[in-house]
């Protein structure tokens, strides 16, 4: 079910903006809505957790550690972020973090770096979907 609400835009013209539901958010980011709903039972709780994900610094820490060549810090950040993504059923993003985390676990920063662009794209898609959902 799609919902719409009206807002006044520039010069007071009435325009419609789509309200994104939590389920639509998960669809947009290729996450597993049914799984997260079975875990937390309540869309309001899920939405609060989505809001907290926006402020999570794990991806930035991963990027910084990778840039500095710090394998241990990169592994810690990737492992933390992957755990959060698993808990929130961010299936697509989690899938891009798996090879990075495992490469870093083995100390192979070059292999992890090869997958960072894909992870960054999925991270951006996930954040974009969450931000659209949080506008409600």
Please name every model-derived segment.
Residues 2-76, 80-136:
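Two-component system phosphorelay core
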């Amino acid at each position: 079910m799609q919902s719409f609400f009206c807002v006044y835009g520039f010069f007071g013209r009435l325009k419609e903006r789509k309200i994104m539901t939590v389920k639509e958010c998960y669809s947009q980011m290729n996450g597993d809505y049914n799984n997260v709903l079975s875990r937390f039972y309540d869309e309001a709780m899920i939405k609060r957790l989505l809001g907290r994900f926006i402020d999570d610094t794990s991806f930035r820490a991963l990027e910084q550690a990778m840039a500095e060549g710090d394998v241990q810090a990169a592994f810690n950040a990737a492992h933390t972020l992957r755990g959060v993504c698993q808990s929130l059923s961010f299936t697509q993003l989690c899938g891009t973090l798996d090879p990075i985390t495992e490469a870093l676990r083995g100390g192979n920063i070059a292999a992890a770096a090869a997958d960072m662009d894909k992870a960054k794209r999925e991270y951006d898609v996930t954040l974009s979907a969450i931000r659209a959902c949080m506008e409600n």
